[in-house]
């Protein structure tokens, strides 16, 4: 009896449980589906909205581009410009702020820039060699109550104190301009030394700086004279601390034959007049063309 | 499966959002460029702000805030102008190309340095790698009125060729300063010795003439050139050119005329530019006290 009862209970109850689970799952599934559909609809709407926004922007850009074209045309014709249509006063002011901020940033590219501080000014001196911008140096200069440098990142071998003594009290602009010359020349010499180290070891070797100011530089390089390889030693002396080209280039070779000596004197003026890496590129390409022509001569000789 | 159905939209949304961001940036740039071309607009906007009512309170607050920002920037710029000697009047920066680790910008800049006006168009490349960021100028065009100054025009083309923008600014600044110094010096001597000093081409020219009022046939020309060398260093070079009639040269047995130029150079070394010219005027023009005191 008991057994039958339990069977009966299990049968009906489990069936009911199953039904309940089924309906629950169905409800969950339906709800999930509904949500997904809703999300899909929302995304669809968002896509449409974004597309509209994009097309509007595109149209606006086109309109401005046409305007710019028109201005260009009038500029060439030498006419006075009217006002750009459709730009509100607010927007104009915003653009004005943008332009002024751009100008402030632009000063960094000129070598001397800075920001006023409570006590004076924080100056940034940027350096460059040809088109490449190099290290920047900073100085915190107090102007009140008395003029003085409170902090700086100028390397110790730059005669900052001496320059400051000469100009800082009387002419801040002059002080910065003299300091700039020292720093820019130093950065330029250092840059050329770094470039020197990137040449292949088979061509340039033993590159060494003589001091931290980079005013003495020695290295060895290989050339071919009359199809024979020679190793030349170069010592470049940068006589002016505000210069980034050497004032003297001493090149030596153990061999004394005239053709080598001739090469030496031509290289010496090449080093004094050109950036170091440019001069070496020139020497190496000269060598290659010579090798090529001698190789082809060799070729014709064989056949 | 439903999830998969959602994906195309999500991808498109992401793409669209990215595109809109890029377009917004472009829009800002063309807006700036249009405004740059019609610079009158800035002034209009500023003028109308000062002269009229703005109905919307909120907007007024925004505008006031913007005006304050403009004022701040202008003060800061003025300060930088004094430090560097450079003044910018118009500037436009445009993105030419942008990727994750590098960007190319195109710049247009109009400005002046003392009385020298310049207009630049250049491109910069900013690249970022793991341990450092670098910036370089990859193209440089300089438009300047420098027909009268051959040294300057030579320097400008050299700088363009080597894309040395920084050197251009620094050398231009000291060149302009020397020009100003020369102009002031010439004008000061003209004022002090109106009869002896002549400025036939104006105070901004490269030379001034000296003559003795009692002997108008003889003239000395002080030529003051401002040289810019290969590395951008600015050096003043002064020369003395005597313009003496041949008859007078024939009488000059001891070679005074011939030695004048080297004598002047020695004088410069000892007394400096100002002192040398002063002494030259005193001795050559034999001025009576009346002229000197004018």
UniProtKB/Swiss-Prot annotation, chain A:
Recorded GO CC terms: kinetochore; nucleus
Provide the species name. Xenopus tropicalis
Protein name according to UniProt: Centromere protein O
Q: What are the alphabetically sorted keywords of the record?
A: Centromere, Chromosome, Coiled coil, Nucleus
Q: What does this protein do?
A: Probable component of a centromeric complex involved in assembly of kinetochore proteins, mitotic progression and chromosome segregation.
Q: Indicate where this protein resides in the cell.
A: Nucleus; Chromosome, Centromere
As for family, the record states:
Belongs to the CENP-O/MCM21 family.
Show the coiled coil region(s).
38-77
Q: Which GO terms describe its biological process?
A: centromere complex assembly
Superkingdom as given in the UniProt entry: Eukaryota
């Amino acid at each position: 009896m008991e057994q039958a009862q339990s069977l009966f209970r299990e049968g009906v109850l489990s069936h009911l449980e199953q039904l309940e689970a089924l309906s629950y799952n169905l409800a969950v599934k339906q709800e999930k589906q509904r949500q997904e559909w809703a999300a899909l609809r929302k995304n669809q709407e968002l896509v449409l909205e974004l597309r509209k926004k994009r097309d509007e922007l595109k149209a606006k850009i086109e309109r401005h581009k046409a305007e710019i074209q028109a201005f260009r045309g009038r500029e060439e014709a030498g006419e006075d410009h009217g006002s750009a249509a459709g730009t509100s006063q607010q927007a104009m002011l915003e653009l004005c702020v943008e332009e002024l901020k751009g100008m402030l940033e632009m000063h960094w590219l000129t070598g001397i820039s800075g920001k006023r501080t409570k006590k004076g000014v924080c100056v940034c001196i940027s350096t460059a060699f040809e088109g490449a911008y190099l290290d920047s140096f900073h100085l915190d200069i107090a102007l009140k109550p008395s003029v003085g440098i409170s902090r700086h990142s100028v390397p110790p071998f730059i005669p900052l104190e001496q320059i400051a003594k000469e100009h800082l009290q009387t002419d801040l602009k002059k002080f910065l301009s003299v300091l700039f010359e020292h720093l820019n020349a130093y950065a330029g010499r250092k840059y050329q030394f770094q470039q020197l180290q990137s040449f292949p070891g088979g061509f340039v070797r033993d590159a060494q700086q003589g001091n931290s100011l980079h005013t003495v530089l020695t290295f060895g390089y290989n050339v071919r004279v009359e199809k024979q390889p020679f190793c030349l030693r170069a010592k470049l002396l940068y006589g002016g601390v505000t210069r980034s080209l050497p004032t003297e280039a001493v090149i030596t070779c153990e061999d004394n034959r005239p053709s080598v000596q001739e090469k030496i004197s031509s290289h010496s003026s090449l080093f004094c007049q050109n950036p170091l890496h440019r001069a070496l590129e020139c020497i190496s390409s000269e060598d290659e063309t010579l090798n090529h022509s001698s190789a082809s001569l060799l070729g014709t000789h064989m056949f | 499966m439903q999830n998969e159905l959602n994906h195309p939209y999500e991808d498109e949304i992401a793409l669209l959002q990215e595109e809109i961001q890029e377009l917004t940036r472009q829009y800002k740039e063309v807006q700036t460029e249009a405004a740059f071309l019609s610079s009158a607009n800035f002034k209009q906007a500023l003028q109308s702000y000062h002269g009229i009512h703005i109905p919307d309170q909120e907007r007024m607050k925004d505008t006031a805030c913007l005006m304050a920002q403009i004022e701040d920037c202008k003060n800061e710029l003025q300060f930088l102008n004094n430090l560097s000697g450079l003044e910018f009047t118009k500037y436009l920066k445009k993105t030419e190309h942008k990727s994750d680790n590098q960007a190319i910008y195109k710049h247009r800049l109009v400005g002046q340095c003392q009385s020298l006006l310049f207009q630049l168009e250049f491109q910069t490349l900013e690249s970022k790698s793991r341990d450092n960021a670098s910036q370089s100028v990859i193209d440089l065009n300089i438009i300047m009125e420098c027909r009268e100054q051959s040294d300057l025009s030579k320097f400008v083309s050299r700088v363009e060729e080597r894309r040395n923008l920084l050197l251009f600014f620094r050398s231009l600044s000291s060149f302009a300063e020397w020009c100003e110094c020369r102009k002031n010096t010439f004008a000061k001597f003209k004022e002090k010795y109106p009869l002896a000093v002549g400025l036939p081409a104006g105070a901004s020219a490269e030379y001034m003439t000296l003559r003795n009022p009692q002997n108008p046939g003889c003239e000395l020309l002080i030529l003051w050139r401002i040289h810019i060398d290969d590395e951008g260093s600015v050096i003043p070079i002064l020369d003395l050119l005597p313009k003496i009639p041949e008859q007078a040269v024939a009488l000059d047995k001891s070679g005074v005329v011939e030695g004048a130029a080297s004598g002047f150079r020695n004088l410069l070394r000892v007394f400096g530019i100002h002192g040398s010219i002063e002494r030259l005027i005193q001795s050559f023009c034999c001025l009576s006290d009346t002229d000197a005191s004018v």
